[in-house]
């Protein structure tokens, strides 16, 4: 059928094409049918939605569609039904536990990106991977397919380094120190980061407090060619676009298939042209990987996958049992990171982890002898060279290079929790800390979060401050206080844990 485009000011949460009931009956089309919309050289696939939002002779497209395709109001298009893609048969193969060939994986990924697969079919694929898994041949094929169906970055400055943390630890602003340290040593490190999904602040959320993070691939190339590094938001780029689509299914199903997680991370490193990749796997209670055995197994998979992609990969298993540094939340973390860069000093957990990771990268990149990377990283940080490099990065990304920590606004609605008894801090609940910061408004409210005054093993007296919640509104502060009282994120115990009488 031929019809005129009507742009609907809605986000359906799906890749939908709308027609009204009368047109659907005439064309014998049904809800969720896969349809193709063509106009000249433009071809768009989507799931059919039947709605009275459009009239006869109209095809409605949602804002979701317009984010990826340019269509004009009133543009004449042709809408036709499309048969079931061959890739659906390959998904069924994996549902039955069979191994997929490279060409089959490529077909699935291509159809995900082209929107030929509907939400239910993508969810079936993700479920099949969760239940039946992928072997390393399949993971490598999936990784390359995910990268090559999106944009690829080609940077002349070599070698290209990269670092990625699989996350789970509150307050992890480590890479804001690592990147300028590595770049100050003459290595190239184009760092793309995510925004928070379930955490209180992703690296991109923190960096955005003091400079821009959304750039095109050409702009990133210009920045990196000039200063040797960047700290940008990966979501503004068309890197491994299938990943963004499958993540929605993973969230809806509350699953995280191991093979898909490996491909998700490494496809973006492959697309960025990274030659040397350091993976940070935080381990401990309350993070994604809780045991050393799990961490070692995952490390082996990353290293093997890197070999198949032509990348040299090393893994750092790091302590993740409590927050990094003393702050959680975008603006608070930005203050702490900038202060550490300016002074060369800061919380031990932040400084030591940043220097440890940067040191490994310096050794991987061949600018520091084996075993001397951390020492070199410390010299770069304490000499101010890392701070000067960070100022260059901030300026090239459109921020004020002379910004000071105190210039950054934090939430002025505060409440401080104190120790209910004297004793020792025996545990800090990562998930509870994250939950409190999010209840306070982070990451959307940049000034929201919390400041920690104690760490595990420290002695406290009754009435000593434990942490302060920051919020931008009284309502958010009240929510965070209620959440904190319910979860009791900091555990304090005396030396006598329990008294048992004579029975």
From Swiss-Prot:
EC supergroup of this enzyme: transferase
Binding site residues for AMP: 168, 194-199, 203, 264, 288
Residue numbers annotated as active site: 256
Keyword Repeat: no
Keywords assigned: Glycosyltransferase, Transferase
SMART domains assigned: PYNP_C
Coiled-coil residues: none
Organism domain of life: Archaea
Catalytic activity annotation: AMP + phosphate = alpha-D-ribose 1,5-bisphosphate + adenine; CMP + phosphate = cytosine + alpha-D-ribose 1,5-bisphosphate; UMP + phosphate = alpha-D-ribose 1,5-bisphosphate + uracil
InterPro entries documented for this protein: AMP_phosphorylase, Glycosyl_Trfase_fam3, Glycosyl_Trfase_fam3_N_dom, Glycosyl_Trfase_fam3_N_dom_sf, Nuc_phospho_transferase, PYNP-like_C_sf, PYNP_C, Pyrmidine_PPase_CS
GO annotation, biological process: AMP catabolic process; pyrimidine deoxyribonucleoside metabolic process; pyrimidine nucleobase metabolic process
Enzyme Commission identifier(s): 2.4.2.57
An annotated GO cellular component: cytosol
Similarity comment: family membership: Belongs to the thymidine/pyrimidine-nucleoside phosphorylase family. Type 2 subfamily.
NCBIfam families: AMP_phos, ARCH_P_rylase, PRK04350.1
Name of the molecule in the record: AMP phosphorylase
Organism, scientific name: Thermococcus gammatolerans (strain DSM 15229 / JCM 11827 / EJ3)
């Amino acid at each position: 059928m031929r019809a005129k485009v009507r742009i609907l000011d809605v986000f359906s949460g799906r890749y939908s094409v709308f027609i009204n009931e009368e047109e659907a009956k005439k064309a014998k089309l049904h809800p969720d049918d896969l349809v193709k919309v063509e106009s000249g050289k433009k071809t768009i696939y989507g799931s059919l939605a039947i709605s009275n939002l459009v009239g006869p002779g109209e095809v409605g497209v949602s804002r979701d569609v317009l984010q990826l395709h340019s269509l004009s109001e009133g543009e004449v298009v042709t809408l036709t039904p499309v048969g079931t893609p061959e890739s659906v048969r390959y998904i069924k193969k994996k549902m039955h536990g069979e191994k997929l060939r490279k060409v089959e994986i490529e077909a699935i990924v291509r159809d995900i990106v082209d929107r030929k697969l509907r939400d239910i079919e993508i969810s079936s694929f993700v479920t099949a991977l969760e239940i039946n898994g992928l072997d390393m041949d399949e993971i490598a094929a999936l990784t390359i397919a995910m990268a090559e169906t999106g944009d690829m970055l080609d940077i002349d400055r070599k070698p290209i380094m990269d670092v990625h943390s699989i996350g789970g630890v509150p307050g992890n602003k480590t890479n804001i120190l690592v990147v300028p340290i590595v770049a100050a040593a003459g290595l190239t490190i184009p760092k793309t980061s995510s925004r928070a999904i379930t955490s209180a602040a992703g690296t991109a959320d923190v960096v955005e407090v003091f400079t821009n993070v959304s750039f095109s691939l050409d702009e990133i190339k210009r920045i990196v060619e000039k200063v040797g590094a960047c700290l940008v938001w990966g979501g503004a780029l068309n890197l491994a676009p299938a990943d963004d689509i499958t993540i929605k299914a993973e969230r809806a199903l509350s699953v995280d298939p191991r093979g898909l997680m490996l491909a998700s991370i490494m496809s973006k490193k492959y697309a960025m042209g990274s030659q040397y990749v350091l993976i940070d796997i935080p381990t401990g209670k309350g993070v994604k990987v809780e045991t050393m055995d799990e961490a070692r197994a995952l490390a082996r998979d990353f290293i093997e996958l890197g070999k198949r992609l032509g990348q040299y990969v090393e893994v750092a298993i790091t302590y993740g049992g409590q927050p990094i540094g003393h702050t959680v939340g975008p603006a608070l973390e930005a203050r702490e990171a900038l202060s550490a860069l300016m002074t060369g000093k800061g919380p031990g957990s932040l400084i030591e982890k940043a220097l440890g990771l940067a040191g490994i990268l310096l050794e991987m990149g061949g600018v520091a002898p084996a075993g001397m990377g951390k020492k070199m990283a410390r010299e770069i940080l304490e000499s101010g060279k890392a701070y000067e490099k960070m100022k260059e990065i901030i300026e090239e990304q459109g921020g004020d290079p002379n910004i000071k920590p105190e210039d950054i606004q934090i939430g002025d609605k505060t409440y401080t929790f104190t120790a209910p008894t004297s004793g020792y801090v025996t545990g800090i609940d990562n998930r509870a800390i994250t939950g409190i910061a999010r209840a306070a408004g982070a990451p959307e409210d940049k000034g929201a979060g919390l400041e920690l005054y104690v760490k595990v093993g420290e002695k406290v007296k009754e009435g000593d401050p434990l942490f302060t919640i920051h919020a931008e509104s009284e309502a958010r502060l009240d929510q965070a206080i209620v959440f904190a009282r319910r979860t009791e994120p900091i555990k304090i115990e005396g030396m006598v844990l329990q008294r048992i009488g004579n029975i």
